[in-house]
């Protein structure tokens, strides 16, 4: 029995429509995965892993770049792989186990080295050359340490509501009786090393109550380990992803269709019935829920439009918190001219201009014979440097090095690497910092879902914002919130924090 012509035409029309929808990425808008994860950095991969473990396997991960890992990303520099972003496992050898440490040190066996800052007093260079007297510097370090200890005691007495919070600088003024805080070149560079080198913002903007003491070190230990493995620190993210995403055994490449790279999310529509996500290539995907793991800097930008707009309380939480900038500048030289040996890995440049190429690291152990130095800048210096040419930055650095080592024949650097996280629209900075005036309740609003839109990222980690382990743990925590709603119908989120 033959089909009627009208039925055949309908079938052809339906087929053409399906092909057209599939070509434009819109077919997914009618069937869609249950959960879309925006971003394949540590928190996004961690969240998707926890969802998968809970039986939510109909996932789609949309990543804006051509790789996973986010701010954990290596690049080749002068023949060696170095880390553009996260580099350390911070918080090791304490009472609790940092969840990243066993993956790095035991499972993957990534090359890592304990960073030893105990000898800084003998490695502080004057602005006009030579080193400061070690005893003098040691006394200034001990003074800074004692002021910080007084700050810890003061922090513990502040009202749980956060109403009495103050900046770290205000605390320093109270204890040092100096109106501007540390003011001499040595005091400023020690201060910069203690705070800016950790938080990427100065003490005048950083919350005392929420950063002193720092939970990362109180919980996990004071030691930090520098990852210097040619596989990259990002190998941790690939390892986690490989536990639930299909991976090619030979190449190690993720081949699971649930991970889509080069998908720049530009719009998220949400309603009581579900979510729709649109990407820059005009693909459209629908789901029951969306987990947004984009950085705080991206949320503060106009890259992703939410429809309807996020409620005022959510927007205020996003804009109240700080997205800091931490820039690691690598330089390659034809030969070494700096001191090496025990206690020489880290050295400081005590400029009269606070934060001007102040913290240096040499890699005798990590990259032997590579002749590479690393200098770190943050905050306004980072933003300034991102907007000038690498040649101009190199010229500034060479001038500093020749001041530090006036008796040496200091050659020009042959290569320079200047990451530009602040300028990158997919990050808009490196990690979050807790500013003064934001209490724990307001902070937890960063993590709180809005309808079917959930949020994760290091900036949503209750105790460990700014750290790799914070991103990892926040992914798990945010996934649990979504699981409670999707599987247990416990969808009402109570904004809370340690103050409750």
Swiss-Prot record:
It comes from Zea mays. Flavoenzyme involved in polyamine back-conversion. Catalyzes the oxidation of the secondary amino group of polyamines, such as spermine, spermidine and their acetyl derivatives. Plays an important role in the regulation of polyamine intracellular concentration. GO terms for molecular function: flavin adenine dinucleotide binding; N8-acetylspermidine:oxygen oxidoreductase (propane-1,3-diamine-forming) activity; polyamine oxidase activity; spermine oxidase (propane-1,3-diamine-forming) activity. GO terms for biological process: polyamine catabolic process; spermine catabolic process. Substrate binds at residues 90, 198, 466. Its main location: secreted. Belongs to the flavin monoamine oxidase family. Transmembrane segments: none annotated. Its EC number is 1.5.3.14, 1.5.3.15. Monomer. This is Polyamine oxidase 1. It is an enzyme of class 1 (oxidoreductase). Pathway: Amine and polyamine degradation; spermine degradation. Disulfide bonds join 485-491. It catalyses: spermidine + O2 + H2O = 4-aminobutanal + propane-1,3-diamine + H2O2; N(8)-acetylspermidine + O2 + H2O = 4-acetamidobutanal + propane-1,3-diamine + H2O2; spermine + O2 + H2O = N-(3-aminopropyl)-4-aminobutanal + propane-1,3-diamine + H2O2; N(1)-acetylspermine + O2 + H2O = N-(3-acetamidopropyl)-4-aminobutanal + propane-1,3-diamine + H2O2. InterPro entries: Amino_oxidase (IPR002937), FAD/NAD-bd_sf (IPR036188), Flavin_amine_oxidase (IPR001613), Flavin_monoamine_oxidase (IPR050281). Induction: Induced by light (at protein level). Down-regulated by auxin (at protein level). One of its GO terms (cellular component) is plant-type cell wall.
